[in-house]
Structure formats: structure tokens, C-alpha cells
Amino acid sequence: LEFGCNGGENACVLASYGANVYLVEPNKKMHDLIKSNFKKIKKLNNLKLLSKDSLEVFKNKKKFDLVVVEGFLNTLKKRNEYFKKISNFLKPKGILIINYDDGYGVIFEFLKSIILLKACKLNGINFRKNDSLKIAKKFFEKEFSKLNKSRNFPSWWKDQLVNPYASKTWKLKDILKLSNSSNLYMYSTSPIFDKSSHFQWYKNLTLIGKKASDKNSYILESWKSNFLSFLFNKSLSQKKKISNKVLIELEVFVNKLGRNIFFGNLKKKILKPKNFLYYL
């Protein structure tokens, strides 16, 4: 079961391996493309449902081995409620795949956005128009070109730098709390948040037999112990687990930064996260 499948390309991959696919795509303009894509791989019979409903109104009594919700869940006002809703579609031992804009990692995108916004203000340019894209290319395209990516620079500019929905971030700790309430545990992530088994004897399977909440708690502590490595995308020596005080300070800073970029006043002063800057 996949919500918001767009053209259904990912679902086609699963269907090519024999999966029966149920798709929920509220943009009905995409339905012909979805059917066409399944016809191309000769798997139209594997497309068991193509619904025009939104996640909010979709109903089905069937349970699924795999539920996929990518690209929008964190932007919904009642995302906690809908997380529980999609969890209820899972069979026992089923897998839920989501993605989200991380409430800490987004700091670097926000800094780029605020640089672009200030440059636009100084030049009398609309932040969300094509002239803004031209300035963004001068600032960021060179570094962007070095990345392994699936979208072009204009798409990234539109989706991330100037998009108000980019401020709708989520945090691992909040997702794990929701997982506990649905008896789910974090199985894997990209990047890898759980490094608990990287530097110990491979037979020490620490999480075997534990409750979902215990596994999630263990994962969160591992995440804190490797926070700088995740944030800066490289291996760093972190002597101790990052404290809740530092995380809260950084969280407040990022939230205010996001609000000021997309909804607020650039002239308003934002206090620097001093305790976090100590780690830099």
C-alpha cells in the first residue's frame, strides 16, 4: 500500500518482483501515467487498487506487508493522527516506510534559504520568482553539482529553499514516541542512526527479544551518541552523548529560523545556539 505514489515508479519496481500493489494518489491527473507505467512492465494485473482518495479519507479493511508514505506526511497538521492511521494498515511484522525533513539536519538548508532571502531583499527581487533562482545558482549550484542526486537544481530550489512546507520538520524522538504507541520499532534508517553493532562482537545482538519501546529507546541513545556524525555527514570523534539541553537549544534556534525565513521578519534577532556552537 502506497500513499502519494505520483507516477507509481517505485510501486512498479515492487510489482516487477511479484508484489500486489494498492496505490492511493489524490492527483487524478497522474492515474493514466500510473496505468501506463504498469502496462510498460506488463504488470497491470498486479495493480489491485488505484484510489483518488487522500490519506485523510482513505479507508480499507485489508492489512498489508508494506506501507509506504513518502514526501508529505511531516507536512500534515494532524501528522501524529495519520501516523497511527497508516500503522493500522500493517500486518503483524509488517514494514512502514516514511521519510521526513529532520528538525536538526535542516539547519544547513535554512541557512542557505536565509542567505538567499537576504540577497533577494537587497536586490528588490521576489524570493519565489525566477530571478531568485538565478541568484541561488550563483551561490549554491557548484556545491549542489557535487552531490549524488535524483532531482535538478531548479527542483531543489523550488522544493527546499523557497518552499514554506520546508519548515514542517519532524524529529526522530517524536517519531519514536509515536512508534511506541503503535508497538512499532525502528528497523533501519538512511543515514544509519543506529551504530550500536558497528564496534562490538557480531554475536552480541543487543536488541533481540526486547520490547518495541526498549528498542526505540536504545536507538535514540545511539543517535545522541553519534549526533555530530549524522549532522555533518562525516565521521567525527564525539566524546560523549549530546545533551538534551543542547538539543533543545538547537531545536528552538532552527524553529525560529524557519519561521523567520518563510513567515516572519528578517530584522527580528535570533539568539545563537551557544552550547551547540561549542561542538563546531
Question: Which residues does each predicted region cover?
Answer:
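Conserved SAM-binding loop of SAM-dependent methyltransferases across substrates and taxa
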Residues: 7-18
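Conserved SAM-binding motif I beta-strand of class I
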Residues: 20-25
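Conserved SAM-binding loop
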Residues: 34-35
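Conserved SAM-binding strand-loop segment of SAM-dependent methyltransferases
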Residues: 42-54
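A short SAM/SAH-binding and catalytic strip from SAM-dependent methyltransferases
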Residues: 65-78
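A short glycine-rich, Lys/Arg-flanked "PGG" loop and its adjoining helix->strand segment in the class I
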Residues: 80-92
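Conserved class I S-adenosyl-L-methionine
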Residues: 95-137
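Rossmann-like AdoMet/SAM-dependent catalytic core
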Residues: 151-280
